[in-house]
Amino acid sequence: MTDSERDKLDKLDILAKRQDAVISIGIGGSYLGNQALFDIFCGSYWNHFSSEERKGYPLIYFVGQNADSASITDLIKQLRRNFYQKKRKLKVLLLLISKSGSTMEPMLAFQILSRNLIDFCELSVVAITNQNKGQIHELAEKNQWTCFNMPEGIGGRFSIFSQVGLVFSKFIGLDIKKFLSGAKMVEESCWSEKWSENPALAMAAIKFIAMKEYGVSAEVIMPYGDKFRAVGWWYAQLLGESLGKKLDIHGNIVHNGRIPVSCVGTTDMHSLTQEHQQGRKNKLLQFISAQEQNKDMDVVCEESGKQGVIKLSKVLSAALHANEKALADDGRMSCHVSMRTVTPFHVGALMYFFFLSTAYEGAMAGINSYDQPGVEDYKKILHSYLSECIEKV
């Protein structure tokens, strides 16, 4: 990041608190990491809190992650309702994120919002895109938007520590220095070539051997706690796009990869665990948890004739460990990555740990973990289908 961009980033603190709402527009890696950060540090009810409870930070919405007219229509209705309640134009910032500047879903969402919000909103735009080319770059120059560069060589699924994640973090008050310091700690701790001294390498080796020697063809990502649900979505993209490759680096057909399946504990212990526990032994479960919860409460519990008070977080933790043991007792594989507590530092460390482990496994498999040629196949077909549907204006 250049000094100029750092200056612009610092100014976002003030800009954020001048907004009624920020709408993050992106898909894939331009969406999933930010959704994960929002869920962890803001929670499901952020937009129901008062401005004081949000410490002056704006309402946050996500669009452009699907070509779904229903959800974007509902967002417009909600903002219009806020306009009537406040009896003034809303200050709304559109955070437009697309490396190519031509990604279909975000660009269509931006088009719809720009057209439909202008009557009752004061719109401003912050863009994150390629600084030298693309539709968004051209629009940013023409309209004098604040624009951040999406660096070359960083794929969307690896972009949470780049401008993509850092700019978004400013709008929710996340301490980005602590977030980056957590990533740096992992980077400095996980470079040994000895797996016994490098936990990211050790996990990569375990999963690689499980896949190649034990027939593991699926990885179930199972974080415990609602706030980590989107971490599962984020890691599923990282795993699928990085390791799911037809060719190795020498051009040989290998069809590498595991099917990523995202679920959440304890919710899915009451549905999917039946298959995990008694279905085919072709799965490895990846558990994610936090040892300490920032918010907790006491509940009365009775087990085995013993009644007393227990922390709800202890129930969550006990359920996870019971799941682990039941799987192990039946010879089924799992890994568990646990944070001590939920802070920007620890979340930064967690996400970078998965980056490194995935990269190490890609190297073991002899594949390129940093491209995604498979997604181009459907795009070519989709463009031809859409061209047949376009009606002349």
Can you say where each PLM-predicted feature lies in the sequence?
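Extended, charge-enriched "interface" segments that sit outside catalytic cores
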Residues: 1-16, 301-306, 322
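Active-site-proximal helix-loop elements at catalytic-domain edges
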Residues: 1-7, 125-127, 192-195, 337-345
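Glycine-rich phosphate/diphosphate-binding loops that line cofactor/substrate pockets in enzymes
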Residues: 8-20, 76-91, 205-217, 276-281
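Glycine-rich phosphate-binding loops that contact phosphosugars or nucleotide phosphates
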Residues: 17-193, 329, 380, 384
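Structural beta-sheet core signal
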Residues: 24, 94-96, 127, 221, ...
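Active-site phosphate/pyrophosphate-binding segments
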Residues: 120-286, 371-393
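Helicase-primase coupling helices
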Residues: 255, 261-343
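C-terminal helical/tail subdomains of lipid-metabolizing enzymes
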Residues: 335, 341-393
